[in-house]
Structure formats: structure tokens, C-alpha cells
């Protein structure tokens, strides 16, 4: 039974926390696609800059040009590449102007965009392609060697077809993007029947249960998240803002919270292909960037960078951070260095299209370090006791559960994981947290055992599976270890077979060949056994506690 309501926290007598923000209704038209909503902006501000590459002399598109590019690309994908409603199209590329153009073109056809990390190995990419059932790859020539074994048609966003051909079988189908869209007219676009409830994207996340799974996100999920993310700007009647996007567009935050949400409002997106702190500051200066979403290591770099004074960063008025809490000392240093900027933290996950809560300091709330802000409009939450599932009032820690129009439909082709995560309409995040008396959400721990390296999630189960595939390894466990720059790094405790002469370097190289750089083991320790319960479950938290207290 729920306790008495606490209106100041948004906590009702039914045990549900509701947003303290004004309502931000989602478009009611069931036939509205995310691309439809986006392209309305071309009618409202056709000559305003929509997208631009961060580097000097890079490509740029106005909203009118964005509309033309999206629809022309959609026509070409349909008529020349055979993309049909429901087909999955894989995007494998760094951030660039053409990345969102292609994603929006895919969704304009009623097809499904599935994104993948360019740092993935061929094995990891092939696994996702197989699971998503992708029929086409959009990429750049430098990444073609990673997909050479897939035998799928390839569209190259750059013009280096010769380099790409050298890595592909002789009978491979390779088309330059410029050739694909040559002579195509946006007027030839014929919109297929698309509903808000149709799948728009399949983004892969380790989620709440470990192994990577395809998160099914609909047009409605993107539309709802866009309203949630931008409603504060609307309430303050802000003019168009300029957002720098260096967080990867293959990730839900870069794709949904930054790129789609801000474009739908009429804000400009500056696409940065690779993060470098000096390049970031140059881009802020060159494009007069107003809004910067970061992860904690970048915030720390900004706070400590000795050359920040060389650049004119006065245009910045908003610095947002997610993925992990910012320490009070870091927040204070950044606030001093950027006195005219709001320093804001938020919380979200792929399964919620990137957003759950966000700080809004201007609302007069007392600033609480470690808070991820209040629920965005339209999201409801409950905190449940992990043993009894009882709803908990403010200032009591339990599992964070949420529901709202931004919540995923489930995991692709994985009923078991879906039923484990979504129960009676509530998404169980796997995170422990609480709301204070003012409705601010604090995330204090993780039920799930993911390792957070900067903005990336690493599933220990994946690395453990690879370790156990080695013929000389009998048992293994992977846990997070604190790191000042990355937040957490993966380390392993390994049980060797009796006659093995494996070294730490041997194990690290074995893993390095099979995973993206951020999943590489930073340390390997050989032990006689892995601590487990009577039922055989790894006592991971016990091991983490021992390691951090230097007892192991």
C-alpha cells in the first residue's frame, strides 16, 4: 500500500511520482511519422542552418536543404537500393551531416534504422547485422574492411570506392551516395502508410540484463522524447540554439536527445566526427555553440584544460552531463570557468529513447549535487523495494521504474528479456535510486552489473563469455574498477587450467582482437577460484568490495 502523497515531490497516494513540469502533449495524429514532424520545420524556417560539419569548410544544410536531402535520399533508397517498409538498414559511420539525413530517409520509407559503433570489431558488427536482419549497409570506405564478410549491398557516404572495393568480394554491390541520389527529385517521394506505433529504429543496448539486445523504438517514442527534451526551451521562449554533437549519433543520446529532438525544434546541429578537446573548443568558437551535452570525462577535461582561455567560449549557455554523476568539486570548477552557463545533469537510457529526468536550475530549485533533476514532462516513475516490490515514498532507496510514451516497445526477438524488463507497463531500469522531497531523482547504484566506460556500456557477461572460450581458461569474472578519466574500466579475475602458462598480456591480447577498444581489459589477475554462491552465481558485488578495499 502506498503512503500519503507528497505533492512537492510529485508523489501521489498511489505511489507514483509524476513530473513537476508543465504538460508537453505528444502529437495525437496516429499517422504522424518522426520524419513528418521534423520536416514541418522546413516550412517554418527554411533558410535557417539545420546541420553543419564542425570542421572549417565542411558540409552544411539549411532546413529547406535538409528536407530536400532526406526526401531525395528516401526516393533513391527505395527506387535504386530496393529498401521497403520494415527493412532494416545498418548505419556504420562517424558523425557527419549525412548520418541523420540517411537515418531520416530510412524512417521516411517506413523502414528501420539500426546503428552500430564504428569501433566494433567485424565479429561484433556481424552479430548485430544477423540479429537485426539488416539488408543494406550505409558506411564510409575506411570502415568497409569491417563488413567485408557480410555480403550485403553497401552505400558509401564518401567517394573512395577504390579503397572500398579492395576489401570486398569482386561481386559486391557498392554504390557511392553521390551516385545514388544523382538526378533524383524530392517531388518523386511517395509517402508509404506509416503509423506512430511503427518501429523506426533498432538501437542496441546492454540494457538491464547484460548481453546486447535490439531496443525497439517507434516513431512515437522519438516524437515523445523530442517534446520532453525541448519543452524547457519552449517554456522559456528561447530562440533557435546551436548544439554541438560530438557524442556518437549511433548512440541514443546523440541520435534522439541531441540530433532529432533539437532539429525538430529548429535548433542547429554541429556534427563533430571525432572528439578532441581542442577541436571541441574550436568548434564552439567557430559556430557560436550555445548548448553542449557531454559525459563526465569531457566535463572534467573542460574544467582542467589549461588552454581554454585561448578560445572564445562565451556563446555557451548550457552544459549538460549524463552517464554518471558529476562530483561536487568538478561542478564547482566548471561553474567558475563558465559562469554564464547552466551546468545541468540528466538521466536516461536507450530503453527510454534517451531521457527520464533533467535538471532545471532556473526553476528555483535548491541545487543538490548528484541529482539528475526532476522527471521530464510525460514520464511517471515509481521506486520499489527490491525484495517486496512495495512502492517507496521520498528519500527511500529502491529500484527506479518508469513509464511514458518514450518507453521502448521491447527487445527485438527476445521475449524473455522484454518480460523481465517491462512488467505491467513499467520499465524496470535496473538502477537503484530515490526521489527527495523536492522531486529530484538521485541514482545511487546499479542493480545491473554493466561497466560504464565514459559514455559506453560494457556487459561483463560478454567479456566473460569470450574469456571462457579460451582453451586454457577455466573460469573468469569481469568487474568494474574506478578510473579517474573513464569513470570505470573492466578488469578480470581468471582461473587458468593447471598446466597453463598464460600471462596477463596473453589474455589481454586475446580479448583485444575481438572487441572494441573501450571493452579491452585494463588488468588481468590470476586466481585459484571465482567467488560464487551455493547456487553457482558469481558474488560480483562481494568481489568488487574486496578489490576496492585492496583485499584482493
Curated annotation (Swiss-Prot):
Stretch list, region SBD2: 346-411
Biological-process GO terms, alphabetical: phenylpropanoid metabolic process
SUPFAM superfamilies in the record: Acetyl-CoA synthetase-like
Catalysed transformations (reactions): (E)-4-coumarate + ATP + CoA = (E)-4-coumaroyl-CoA + AMP + diphosphate; (E)-4-coumarate + ATP + H(+) = (E)-4-coumaroyl-AMP + diphosphate; (E)-4-coumaroyl-AMP + CoA = (E)-4-coumaroyl-CoA + AMP + H(+)
Chain positions covered by the region annotation SBD1: 276-345
Keywords: ATP-binding, Ligase, Magnesium, Nucleotide-binding
GO molecular function, one term: ATP binding
Binding site for ATP: 205-209, 213, 345-346, 350, 431, 446, 537
Chain sites annotated for binding CoA: 274, 454-455
Keyword Endoplasmic reticulum: no
Cofactor section: Mg(2+)
Family matches, as Gene3D superfamilies: 3.30.300.30, N-terminal domain of ligase-like
Pfam families per UniProt: AMP-binding, AMP-binding_C
Enzyme class: ligase
Binding site for (E)-4-coumaroyl-AMP: 253, 323, 345-346, 350, 448, 452
Top-level taxon: Eukaryota
EC number: 6.2.1.12
PANTHER family linked: 4-COUMARATE--COA LIGASE-LIKE 7, LONG-CHAIN-FATTY-ACID--COA LIGASE
Family, per entry: Belongs to the ATP-dependent AMP-binding enzyme family.
Domain comment (free text): Both substrate-binding domains (SBD1 and SBD2) are involved in the substrate recognition, and are sufficient to confer the substrate specificity.
Function as written in the Swiss-Prot or TrEMBL entry: Carboxylate--CoA ligase that may use 4-coumarate as substrate. Follows a two-step reaction mechanism, wherein the carboxylate substrate first undergoes adenylation by ATP, followed by a thioesterification in the presence of CoA to yield the final CoA thioester.
Full protein name: 4-coumarate--CoA ligase-like 1
Protein species of origin: Oryza sativa subsp. japonica (Rice)
